[in-house]
Design a protein with these regions (language model features):
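Conserved "HGTGT" condensation-loop signature of ketosynthase/thiolase-family condensing enzymes
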Residues: 1-400, 406-436
Length: 436
């Protein structure tokens, strides 16, 4: 996991929040001396934070295997490049030399919770997915670059950002699928592979990937992408990222004609597992730290069919029912020890949450307890569309270090509240901090 806000990452953020111990003010400095004093340095900080966030998560993905990536950013002006166009640069900033990325989906949106919905729908729709990366970026510098409609940049008036840089990258895996679809068929071979060791299927996959990703001419992804832009009425521009998973998979039938598929058992290649993993790739997967478990999101409608907010008493009842549904996603008998939420843009919505939790029994966390209720809009600042993943990231850190499940609840632009639970791993490596 790579959680970055401002200059801090992962448990640096959590430790600062805990040290501040104030649910009404930010841990972040309010001194201009602690922030970039020029546009160049501002962009440098943005690039460093982006690369660090992605590196902390993606370097644990399995090398030489194309990992699908979801990347979300705030809204942009029509002439600004889409988020997927940044994947190549982010990979380079993160120094991920043997990591292959697939553009699974991207979005410019005001609703960061959709990335969690898309992730779960993706795993449901594709039973051969072993792992995927989800990424959100936001902040004053990002919105300035994106020329986000309605955003007014104030950097020239004050270098203390109205929105801190906030980047979150999560590597989400399904070990049950690796155990069932990959581990029994893994092939024993050397780790000393490069583009010339073409006797191995893993090398053939590497070479075919780059041939297709960097290809030019009528049958290339670049040509396909340009045609797609024209069809959508968009001024064609060069694509500098990674090819889409959808297009890549249309190329695989030709690739499968070239592989040997030698190894134990009857392995059948699939769109997301195009060749057998090697035993050392399986070890890479096994050695990645398990930070916790992400539970299925529960949506709670707080508005009627016409978008009009429900009355407070109705919101309380809806949240109480949704809370119980979310608790039911946890292992039997487990209840969350803390809750992360965000009152940015709507301080009043804390009232129905408070009442719903109070009516849910003594085991529910209290927003009034500084060690149980975490308003990240106050404790950090406006993290925009990154807020849902910031909450999840902090919940993972808190649960890992202090035990117990953590709840996150995000009030979305469509009048829905989405509750996501995270729970700690059952076994932790002693004397290892996986957030560093």
């Amino acid at each position: 996991m790579g959680l970055v806000t401002g200059r801090n990452a992962n448990d640096e953020i959590w430790n600062a929040i805990e040290a501040k111990a104030d649910n009404h003010s930010t841990y972040m400095s309010q001194s201009p001396a602690d922030y970039p004093d020029s546009e160049d340095s501002r962009m440098t900080y943005l690039g460093v934070g982006t690369g660090l966030s992605f590196q902390l998560a993606a370097h644990h993905s399995v090398g030489y295997w194309p990992v699908p990536v979801f990347i979300w950013e705030p809204p942009k002006a029509s002439h600004v490049s889409r988020p997927a166009n940044e994947l190549s640069g982010i990979r380079q900033e993160a120094s991920l030399g043997v990591t292959l990325l697939l553009w699974q989906e991207d979005a410019n949106t005001n609703d960061g919770s959709t990335i969690i919905e898309k992730l779960f729908a993706f795993f449901d729709a594709h039973p051969d997915i072993p792992e995927a990366i989800i990424v959100t970026f936001d902040g004053a510098a990002t919105r300035d670059l994106n020329q986000t409609p309605g955003y007014v940049d104030t950097f020239k008036q004050s270098n203390i950002p109205t929105m801190p840089d906030s980047m979150v990258a999560l590597l989400v895996s399904r070990s049950d699928r690796v155990d069932r679809l990959i581990r029994p068929y893994a092939v024993e071979q050397t780790e000393n592979v490069d583009k010339n060791t073409t006797e191995y299927d893993i090398t053939k996959l590497w070479n075919f990937f780059w041939e297709k990703n960097n290809g030019e001419g009528p049958g290339s992804f670049e040509a396909y992408y340009q045609e797609q832009q024209k069809a959508a009425g968009i001024q064609p521009r060069a694509f500098l990222g990674f090819m889409s998973a959808q297009w890549w998979q249309t190329q695989l039938p030709d690739f499968w004609k070239t592989i040997s598929n030698k190894g134990p058992g009857e392995f059948k290649p699939t769109p997301y597992i195009p060749v057998r993993w090697t035993t050392w790739q399986v070890r890479q997967f096994d050695n990645a730290p398990l930070l916790g478990y992400l539970h299925r999101p529960i949506d709670v409608k707080l508005a009627d069919a016409h978008g009009k907010p429900l009355k407070t008493a109705q919101q309380v009842q809806a949240l109480k029912a949704g809370w119980q549904q979310a608790v039911d996603t946890l292992p039997t008998g487990e209840t969350p020890k803390r809750i992360f939420y965000d009152t940015t843009g709507d301080r009043a919505w804390v009232a129905p949450i408070n009442q719903a939790l109070a009516q849910s029994g003594p085991s529910a966390p209290s927003l009034d307890d500084v060690k149980e209720g975490y308003d990240i809009g106050r404790r950090i600042g406006n993290t925009g569309i990154s807020s849902p993943l910031v909450q999840i990231g902090l919940g993972l850190i808190a649960s890992y270090h202090e035990g117990g499940a953590s709840a996150t609840i995000h009030h979305r632009p469509n009048g829905t509240a989405t509750i996501v639970m995270v729970s700690p791993p059952t076994h932790k490596q002693p004397d290892v901090n996986p957030f560093r």
